[in-house]
Regions:
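Conserved beta-strand/loop scaffold segments within soluble protein domains that form the structured core
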Residues: 20, 25-27, 33-285, 289-292, ...
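C-terminal functional modules
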Residues: 1-26
Length: 307
């Protein structure tokens, strides 16, 4: 039974107010709190290490998988390995948020390592929200790793966001588009404040003929926080890739964006762009003339930027 704080975190990171249809696995402080399988999706605990295997039957359509994680014990360190086996022709949405509540003096940390094996012509929409809260001096640390292997015609859309309260994060994403006409789309949103620190590293490797990727990273760095981005795309076949990184910097924050594209085939077409800057004064002025305070105008602009 979840307490009120745990329920609030669950809703924040997964939009769950009750148990939804489909497969569900709720992890609380390193233990299985709740599990539900569906006819076409089975969740099984690993026997050799912490984590679960999620097996999605071929041609499963319009089903959801929720696997949220909650940490509510100060000083707790959680390492988990989750493997997803997505059958041919399946079309599913996977929600995998993580929230930490830390009111103590010791650091709390969750390291989630997710590996996807996406079958021929299968489609995956992966949604991941990270959030931290608590008045204690202990840090809230999240270090996710996401590894994806795509077969012919397979695709994944990854919507990942860090919506606040995470003191330290090191994010790593690796996608191998091995099959012909496979596709990777990554939409990353990141917010830091105070003295928080975030590193995001991505490798998208386009091996399949006609494979393609679009990587979009948007971030806001406030106060004295720091962010570093390393989005890398490698084209080893006739393929297309585009990387776009945009950051808003405020106060004494620091942001580094270091995109890299590598073409290893004459018919690989790759491009990147990066922009870092403050909120334009005319944007604030326009909203202030509509009756907003400077603080309200600033928040409205940031909200739209990270939407």
């Amino acid at each position: 039974m979840l307490n009120d704080i745990q329920k609030s975190i669950l809703q924040t990171v997964s939009d769950m107010v009750s148990i939804p249809d489909g497969a569900v696995n709720i992890r609380l402080d390193g233990q299985k709190e709740f599990r539900q399988n569906s006819e076409h999706i089975q969740i099984v605990s690993k026997t050799d290490k912490n984590g679960i295997d999620i097996r999605i039957a071929p041609f499963t359509k319009s089903e959801n998988v929720h696997i949220p994680v909650i940490l509510s014990k100060s000083g707790f360190h959680d390492l988990v390995y989750n493997d997803f086996f997505v059958g041919e022709g399946a079309d599913v949405t996977i929600v995998a948020g993580c929230g930490i509540h830390n009111c103590g003096d010791c650091d709390s940390e969750h390291d989630g390592i997710h590996t996807f094996y996406i079958g021929k012509n299968a489609k995956v929409h992966y949604i991941e929200k990270h959030y931290g809260e608590g008045e204690g001096s202990g840090k809230r640390i999240l270090n996710p790793q996401t590894i994806v292997y795509l077969e012919e015609g397979a695709s994944i859309v990854m919507d990942t966001s860090q919506i606040g309260g995470v003191d330290d994060t090191k994010r790593y994403t690796k996608c191998e588009a091995n099959g012909a006409n496979s596709e990777v789309q990554i939409n990353e949103k990141l917010l830091t404040a105070g003295d928080q620190h975030a590193v995001s590293e991505m490798d998208v490797i386009l091996n399949g003929e006609g494979s393609r990727t679009r990587v979009v990273s948007r971030s806001v760095a406030k106060e004295a926080s720091t962010q570093i981005f390393y989005p890398r795309v490698q084209g080893n076949a006739p393929c297309f890739g585009h990387v776009s990184c945009d950051s808003i910097i405020m106060g004494a924050a620091k942001v580094r964006s270091i995109p890299e594209i590598s073409c290893n085939h004459v018919d690989a077409a790759l491009m990147h762009e990066a922009a870092i800057g403050k909120i334009a004064g005319e944007q604030l002025l326009k909203l202030e003339t509509l009756g907003l305070t400077p603080e309200e105008a600033e928040e409205k602009i940031l909200e739209g930027f990270l939407r």
